[in-house]
């Protein structure tokens, strides 16, 4: 997960944020925890980190939930964003430098859409609502990020917010850039008519306007690989005339509960706020999520939480001792494992080994317990 240059240089990361229509669940927490670890690793290496995260504060799911609950969509978004930030702070997930709502970036979106229309990479679908679409074949490299074949792309496009059956499109995979205004929907003025942004172009516009080209990392959950991240990169590459939006594309695995992926549609969410409300310490939640590798799909359970709580207790007992075994090697190994694809299971195992030695055999290094606690805090974000 190294950045492009040495200590003191800038390291840049854009991570897709939430659509704020419901509370933060453990799937969200696991994703943002993964990028928090990268953030912390870069800071430890001495980089000046420019981390940007968006919030999709105008989108169909948000508008539908607001209509269902009889609440203004802006009030709903503001409420859920506030709760999300509260949960992230409780989990000690460092805030990005820039936290940007889609509604704050309308002018940037309009500028990108204008450029794509001018170059022929976008077109207007004739009809009652003149929506603007991006041509999936506008860049030769389209598809490199996901590596999916066309059949897989079409299936995921339909499942994840795309509209392959939309009449008038040149290609079923062409993605919405600008949704022309409909009655009862929020809209903004533009040279090509009132409307609102498509999902993917929001992120391209925010990333380019806040960071620019050549990101070190574009990141998010693995369910965003296609179509969202593929099209976000394609939009940016098309406008900038570049082959690659980011040096690395990083995706966190999904969190399941009771044998199924955790999702709003399934109704099996484990909410961070609910766990906190039950008195579960956020540090234990964090450790439970760190017990699995960030890229793998994994399951949350009461056993995972119990094991994390016990681990936290042992670590705190060991680091409260007046002395312990030398800490140099264990801290070096934690850094080494995190630098190797964020291998948190090995990092936690190394700390477990030091903890066992400290509790079972003691030690003579009076600085060691404090050094271990400081390293765990800085590198893993767990306060002991």
UniProtKB/Swiss-Prot annotation:
Q: Which cofactor does it need?
A: Zn(2+)
- Signal peptide boundaries: none
Keyword Zinc on entry: yes
Q: Which UniProt keywords apply?
A: ATP-binding, Ligase, Metal-binding, Nucleotide-binding, Zinc
Report motif location: 'KMSKS' region: 261-265
User: What is the top EC class of this enzyme, as a single word?
Assistant: ligase
Motif, 'HIGH' region: chain positions: 18-28
Catalytic reaction annotation: 1D-myo-inositol 2-amino-2-deoxy-alpha-D-glucopyranoside + L-cysteine + ATP = 1D-myo-inositol 2-(L-cysteinylamino)-2-deoxy-alpha-D-glucopyranoside + AMP + diphosphate + H(+)
Cofactor binding note from Swiss-Prot or TrEMBL? Binds 1 zinc ion per subunit.
Q: Name the residues that bind L-cysteinyl-5'-AMP.
A: 16-19, 31, 54-56, 199, 221-223, 255
Q: Where is Zn(2+) annotated to bind? A: 16, 203, 228
Give the Gene Ontology MF terms in alphabetical order: ATP binding; cysteine-glucosaminylinositol ligase activity; cysteine-tRNA ligase activity; zinc ion binding
A cellular-component GO term for this protein: cytosol
Q: What's its EC?
A: 6.3.1.13
Per the Swiss-Prot or TrEMBL annotation, the motif 'ERGGDP' region is positioned at: 159-164
State whether it acts alone or in a complex, and with which partners, per the record: Monomer.
Provide the function of this protein.
Catalyzes the ATP-dependent condensation of GlcN-Ins and L-cysteine to form L-Cys-GlcN-Ins.
Return the HAMAP family for the record: MshC (MF_01697)
What name goes with this protein? L-cysteine:1D-myo-inositol 2-amino-2-deoxy-alpha-D-glucopyranoside ligase
Instruction: Give the originating organism.
Output: Mycobacterium avium (strain 104)
